[in-house]
C-alpha cells in the first residue's frame, strides 16, 4: 500500500499498538528548555525514576534569558529559578545542557539542527509548540505538554494518535526577494489559522525544493500557525549536505548508510492525502499580517481590508476585533502604517541566512528616527558566524541593537517587549494580542521586510528598495 511520508515516519516508530487503543511511539530526540521542564523533572524525582535515555535528551536555555547580559539574575526571580532548576536537573539526571556560558546555547529549534541533533527520519519532541521546525529535515517533530515531557524522560515513548494528512504544493518558482516567510504566510492566508487542524502537513512543489534548509525550517516552524500538528519536507540532497559533518550527525560509512535510508523517506507515488492545497509561487508577494492571527495577512502593497468584505460572519467579527486592537482603519495602504519597534529573531527567522538578508537592506542606511530595532541571533554559533562576516557591524552602524541569543521579543518572557500601543514589525511567528507585551501590536514579516520597516519607519516593499 502506498504511504505518505508522515505515515512512514509514524509506522516505523510504533512500539506497541493494541486494538482500539492509542499507539505508543518511540521518541528519538527530546529537546528540553527551562520553562516546560521543571515540573517534569520533579515528577521523576518524586517517583524515584531516572531519565531512561539521557543521551537522547538535549537541553538549552532560551525562553526567558536576557539578550543583554549572561547574568542569570537579569530577567527576574521566576526566570532565575527556572534556569537554576534546569542546571540542577540536567546535572542530577545526566542530561547535556547548553547553559548561558556554553558556546552552543541558543533557541532550542536553532540549536538542534545546527548541532546535528535533528536528523531525517526521527521522531523529535519538545515542550514547545514550534517543535514542528525540525520537520524541515523529514523528521516527525511536534510540541508536547509538561506531563508528556515527564513521560518521555521516563520512558522514551509517547502515546500518539494518527493525524490526518495534508499536502500543500507550491508550484513554480518564487520571484526574487520572496522568502520562505512570505510563502508560509501566503499559505496560512489561504488555509486560515485553523485550516490544518488535526493534520500533519507535507510541503512540496518546486518552490519548496528550491528553499535552503533554513528556509524549510521557517516553513515548518509555522505549520502550527495553521493549526497543524506538524509540518514536513521530504529530505533530499539539500538536507544531506546541511547535515553532513555536524557534531551529532553520523560519520563516514554510517553517514552513507544513513543517506541510503533517508532517501526512502518520500511519499510514495499513488499515496492519498486527506486534504490538498495548491498555490502558485509566482503569485506570492512580500507578506505582512494586519490582524491578530497569522491568517490575517495581505501583500505589502494592499490596503487594510474592510471587515464588511468578509462573507463569513465569524471572520467579519474577528476582523473587526483585530482592527480595533491593532488601531488600524480599513482602506489604509499598508505602506502608510508607521512602526515603533522592529524585532529580527525567533526560532522562525534568526539563522545566518535571515541575518544576511536583513543586513543587505540595513547596509549603508540608518534606522528611522524614533524606531528601536533589535537583532537577536538564534544561537551562539549564529552570532559568531554573523560577527565573522561583519554583519554585526552593519547592524550597529545602521542603528540596530546587536543582542545575545535567546527567544527575546517573540514572546516577551524576558525584558524585551512592547509597551501598550507600540507597533512592531517582527520576524517571529505569532501576532496574537499581547504576545510581545501587553497591548503590543505585532505585524509578522520576513527579515528583509523587517529591516526595510526599520530604515523607513513604516512598512515598505523590499522590491522598491535599491
Curated annotation (Swiss-Prot):
Organism: Shigella dysenteriae serotype 1 (strain Sd197)
One GO term (biological process): L-leucine biosynthetic process
Catalyzed reactions: (2R,3S)-3-isopropylmalate = (2S)-2-isopropylmalate
Cofactor(s) for this UniProt protein: [4Fe-4S] cluster
Annotated residues for binding of [4Fe-4S] cluster: 347, 407, 410
Protein name as annotated: 3-isopropylmalate dehydratase large subunit
Cofactor note as given: Binds 1 [4Fe-4S] cluster per subunit.
Lineage: Bacteria, Pseudomonadati, Pseudomonadota, Gammaproteobacteria, Enterobacterales
Gene3D superfamilies in the record: Aconitase, domain 3 (3.30.499.10)
Stored Pfam families: Aconitase (PF00330)
Organism domain of life: Bacteria
InterPro entries reported for this sequence: 3-IsopropMal_deHydase_lsu, Acnase/IPM_dHydase_lsu_aba_1/3, Acoase/IPM_deHydtase_lsu_aba, Aconitase_4Fe-4S_BS, Aconitase_4Fe-4S_dom, IPM_dehydratase_rel_enz, IPMI_cat
Record key words, sorted: 4Fe-4S, Amino-acid biosynthesis, Branched-chain amino acid biosynthesis, Iron, Iron-sulfur, Leucine biosynthesis, Lyase, Metal-binding
Gene: leuC
